[in-house]
């Protein structure tokens, strides 16, 4: 990578030093674009790809149409646009890629040595469009281009393997469409020849091996010939071991090999998937920005769950080891982005005392990496000149991350610091069960289980009825019922919608919560005078979209002969993304310096929303909090219908909120919340300036508070991630406030009712405070449990009004 970074720096400097009308400029731009494209292929940084497209396009634009080199530049444009299509799925990029690649071929004589390369670009783009739209004509044309590229390339040419691999991919795609066995056989032959022509340490060899393995695996599934299975697994395992290949290619190879062996040899399959899980941090290293990390991890969603399920399915392994190993995989393969930041925010007191220089540099680098890329780069370079382009920012961010790795290596080399900023082991995590068990779910096509962490160790409860297909069906039905339950139309059957909600809560009890609580011995409510037991849910993936804390048969709980069959009537529930995140939250529970302070952010009106997004009960909610909580600081949106005004520092802007967060103990937000449907890092609380400077999940990442104890997010969907590919990452506002340093956070799983939300807030703080305004934030989970349970008793038929609120954290 150092060679590639240096190539890009030299290429950029050459372009900048060359006049715009210089005849060599196009060639220099092309070289720069090629290098940027190569770095994108390795790391997946979109800024590199965008810069590569810009450079290639400019090279083509400044070159006369009859110039012999124009075809090179057009082909580069096509290749880069096709790569961007594969990242974002924008069909216009793909159509433009095909046009540019075809123009390059048409402008090239048949005996030109570069013609094969241009034909290969045409093949890749046409095959991508076939996979998107399904037009067989595109696939046939792609195959023709790939075959011509092979035919005109000498047998000893270094690029011949590329073209052969393309032939194999196109033939495999045609077999999957038409089922002609000859196509599959030819695909395997072409892929095998590509592998044989490639040196064992070449980074492209992993891709060629993967293509061979995929084709052999398809033939095995069709014919059942064991030699095909063995050869497919061998090819994929070898691909995963090519150290010079991109980590994402190696992960896909290992995952595919494990998938082929899952039914026949779950033990070996589990080992292969475990190796792939261990590579995930390299797929999305800290040096990449958040959006690139999310995209790269989203494409590998569910990998840790597959690995854990296969570990549990390996009956040849000792039973007492399987559960612990499975839990370790889920801990290391889920919530990676959160874990990266949490790992570097431990207590530095001893390090500062013994090694102040190292501690200071570690802190500087950590804070740079916690910032959004544009900010961190400016701080890192201390450059007063023009802001760098995004590709340069991305490179500089990686350099900061590389220096952080060196500093971490130095720190871990010191006596007593060997585990500094490393993920906790399963043994480390066992200590987190002292206050109550932690239940980690894994809903998977191979098998579904709950892993129970107690002070005695880790055990598992099989959940055979909790299949992904069934869970997805219930999730869709649940959220549709929630929407129907608040439908304002006169003819809406809201009672029937609430009935569907109750039915799904009962199903969630029968299939998930009840088996877990029974296994843990929580078979009923505690005896009078006894403390309610606590339990932490780490739902992971699909179950994070359903309210485990509200599972149960709520309308039957008082029926004669019926045991208390609800979670609310047996335990106090809390949530955590992982056990490591719970450990992090508990590191922030030391008493803050007295006196406590409270920040109240109230948005009874929201600029830019229809009818100003009126929340009439917010004013009442804020007034109640002012009267009850210690040293309240109120930021509130002024009423535009009256002459009421507010000083600038009293208006709830993001800047005003951030200014106060460093000093407060409790933060309460009564406002609209918005869960972003595709990029959860852009989920936000809608404050006064939400359209200009939103308070998003991403903007909270740099925040690292010392005095914070409780954040109450009285807003819609603040504990919800909507992008299904990122469910394992738990990216939402509730976890963002946990990361910022709040050990207790109250969030919501769906849209909440304004009036009832204010009532829940009032009842919660009534239970949490005394007459002297002393607040026991460590009782937050109990206070919410008692509040919701009481409201449930009043409104058992309308769970949508009381089941959304949850407690997350310590």
PLM ranges: what are they?
Residues 8, 46, 50-53, 91, ...:
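Conserved positions within tetratricopeptide repeat
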Residues 541-543, 578-674, 713:
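A domain-level signal for caspase-like cysteine endopeptidase catalytic cores
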Residues 1-210, 218, 223-225:
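Thr-biased low-complexity repeat/linker tracts and other Thr-enriched repetitive architectures
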